[in-house]
Amino acid sequence: MTPLIFVTGGVVSSLGKGIAAASLASILEARGLKVTMVKLDPYINVDPGTMSPFQHGEVYVTDDGAETDLDLGHYERFVRTRLSRNNSVTTGRIYQNVICKERRGDYLGATVQVIPHITDEIRRCIDEATASFDVALVEIGGTVGDIESLPFLEAIRQVRIERGAERTMFMHLTLVPYIAAAGELKTKPTQHSVKELRSIGIQPDVLLCRSEQVIPDSERRKIALFTNVSERAVIGCPDIDVLYGMPLELRRQGLDEIVIDQFKLSGTASLADLSEWEDVVDAIKHPLDEVTIAVVGKYVDYQDAYKSVGEALKHGGLRQRTKVNLKWVEAQDLEGSDMGALKDIDGILVPGGFGDRGFEGKVLASRYAREQRVPYFGICYGMQAAVVDYARHVAGLEGANSTENDRQSPHPVIALITEWRTTTGEVERRDEKSDLGGTMRLGLQEQRLKAGTLVRELYGRDVVGERHRHRYEFNNRYRTQLEDAGLVIAAKSMDDTLVEMIELPREMHPWFLACQAHPEFLSTPRDGHPLFIGFVKAARARKAGGKLLREVCV
């Protein structure tokens, strides 16, 4: 059985369980172990696909088309394992599975209850996601004490009883607040959080103590004494300047050794080589250049809605030792034709979104970038905005629009995808009356790049795969008309039915590119992504007056 590390949180939410778990996973991976991660979310939605970005942040998409929590994005940025729908489990999905089994008669007339049926289904999902790995980390969403989390906590308690301490570890992330008026760190919240956890039968093996500053040894000893945790296993997690430095911090405190010792993996695990993370941190701390990118979006008041976009831009910068400053611009604010927010920036990125609010602002941002020759990168809705702008103002298609926003448009250059082929070869069909949840073109889709284009140059190969999440697409009825007006169809689906990327000829614009997919989901700090690296390079060139000041790379 795969050794499991269960990660819980206490005192308050948003302490960074996902980052801490992913950082530990990256160290174990660096020691030669095959690692995976799972997120257990206590909300009743089947998945986050229909949840408001203002409440939940971005919806992260995996290769197999699962719409998941943004924590899976953190996981994939820290470890090289590609995750799937099995790695994201919600209360809604658990209950849906159990109810389907009950309707089929799988329980043979039994009264279906939280224990054992719900907890058994949770355990089954954990086993399914973690089989065949050397180690798996399982994060339980929410905070200990929340009523929604109780079935998950009961399930992992049962796992510990069944597998024992050599195959399970409980890691609890808690807060050690600093009270400025008293000039002291307070350990009482941590003690109470562990007490709450122990009341439901779970004794932590490791405590990760979040704090604003380094926790003195005397306080660590106190925490260990009153929580029944070894002093060695009380790990301080102070605020750090660089998020991607967390693996180095946890390694410095020997957290991976605690895991190796408890699971008796010393014969399997090699010494950790964290040189890649050292390079990443060094590039972030010591940039040689700096650019400012305007992100024109609909949900900029809650930047977690664009978490992967922001991270991918930073990755693109650190691969060339460039600090990327993000200027968040509300798309609606541009609809009065005041482009002041886009002045003195080095590049414009228009990310994805849904609905008509702010769409005209995105179209205007595309037009501004095109006419002012500012590097432009459109993603999903950002590509659709660029197509609408080009159709209206270059191709002369007055009233061009997306049918998502105007079903009576005389020139619907963007329209609902009614049929497409999945990666398994099955044909999917949709119409305007289809459910919203799980009905989009989702997951990794291959596309063929056109020879001689900017995207072909950036990727360096003819066929690439990118993750998608969209319901509307470039209308093929206008393909020839827009190409005749100068628009370049830079990539198409493998069956030639869907337009995947567009760009402008380089004699018309130095760097204008847009894609229907979401390349931000495949960007990592150690590797970056060709499109984001190219975009930041173009922004550097604009800042330098058309010529790069210095070629640098990590």
Curated annotation (Swiss-Prot):
Mg(2+) binds at D71, E139. The lineage of its organism: Bacteria, Pseudomonadati, Pseudomonadota, Gammaproteobacteria, Lysobacterales. The active site is at C380, H518, E520. GO terms for cellular component: cytosol. This is CTP synthase. Catalyzes the ATP-dependent amination of UTP to CTP with either L-glutamine or ammonia as the source of nitrogen. Regulates intracellular CTP levels through interactions with the four ribonucleotide triphosphates. It holds the Pfam family GATase. GO terms for molecular function: ATP binding; CTP synthase activity; glutaminase activity; identical protein binding; metal ion binding. Residues 1-265 are annotated as: Amidoligase domain. It comes from Xylella fastidiosa (strain 9a5c).
